[in-house]
From Swiss-Prot:
Assigned protein family: Belongs to the EF-Ts family.
Protein name: Elongation factor Ts
Alphabetized Pfam families for the sequence: EF_TS
Protein's organism: Aliivibrio fischeri (strain ATCC 700601 / ES114) (Vibrio fischeri)
GO cellular component: cytoplasm
Length: 281
């Protein structure tokens, strides 16, 4: 059997863009014949998938699945909204989230478990696909809400199903960062306080007066970034805390995921640039 050298692995990586372990495996199976390895990788879609891996995947879907008091929220990305609605893509996402909620696996474990399936899907669809993140929420009472494919929310707490569902809808729309005003970390409060003091002083207020003014502003700030402090979207004259009290309900935790959060999308290519790229070949 021919020896698979580091130089061969390096060359195959450069020619296909695939990962080191994938290249080594392909060379072993091809008895160190690099041309055969490339041919086999092309057939399996591995080479194509590797080339697509550099493409920004900022579209996709948030999938939610509940099982035995645990809900999994999964983000799977693709490159276009069209593929996000493709049945092959959605079937893949459903398969991954089912495995996630059954085992509460980390995203790294899910990525490893479904890598071969992902590579095959990339080859079939022609876009980069990425299992980006997964989060779990546990509780005796869970309510979930999806706004299209793009936003997913799960709320854990106590109360009737309708109330918790409405709270989940509120979270989707209002993007709170914490459950209660008291949950806002001290460093976040101090940072915002410093900003507000500076704003007040820039308005011509002496520092002592500025700091007193900021006390009211900070109460408003912690209310705006926390669920229970926000005005309820369905009854804006009441806070979420007041609604929960009226309904005899409470919220202990929530997770809100939105497709593409934090992903920098590539600038869209103009028609002229597209033509130039085609001419370059």
């Amino acid at each position: 059997m021919a020896t698979v050298t580091a130089a061969l692995v390096k060359e195959l990586r450069e020619r296909t863009g695939a990962g080191m372990m994938e290249c080594k495996k392909a060379l072993v199976e091809a008895n160190a014949d690099i041309e055969l390895a490339i041919e086999n990788m092309r057939k399996s879609g591995a080479a194509k998938a590797a080339k697509k891996a550099g493409n920004v995947a900022a579209e996709g879907a948030i999938i939610i699945k509940e099982e035995n008091g645990v809900a999994a929220l999964l983000e799977v990305n693709c490159q276009t909204d069209f593929v996000a609605k493709d049945s092959n893509f959605t079937a893949f996402a459903e398969e991954v989230v089912a495995a996630a909620v059954a085992t509460q696996a980390t995203v790294e474990e899910l990525q490893a478990q479904f890598e071969e399936t992902r590579v095959a899907l990339v080859a079939k669809i022609g876009e980069n696909i990425n299992i980006r993140r997964v989060q779990y929420v546990a509780g005796s009472a869970l309510a979930s809400y999806r706004h299209g494919e793009k936003i997913g929310v799960v709320v854990a707490g106590e109360g009737d199903a309708e109330t918790l569902k409405h709270i989940a809808m509120h979270v989707a729309a209002s993007k709170p960062e914490y459950v209660n005003p008291s949950d806002v970390p001290a460093d976040v409060v101090e940072k915002e306080k410093a900003v507000q003091v500076e704003i007040a002083m820039n308005e011509g207020k002496p520092q002592e007066i500025a700091e007193k003014m900021v006390i009211g502003r900070m109460k408003k700030f912690t209310g705006e970034v926390s669920l229970t402090g926000q005005a309820f979207i369905m009854e804006p004259k009441k806070t979420v805390a007041e609604i929960l009290k009226e309904k005899g309900a409470s919220v202990s935790n929530f997770v809100r995921l939105e497709v593409g959060e934090g992903i920098e999308k590539a600038a869209e290519m103009s028609f002229a640039d597209e033509v130039a790229a085609v001419q370059k070949g």
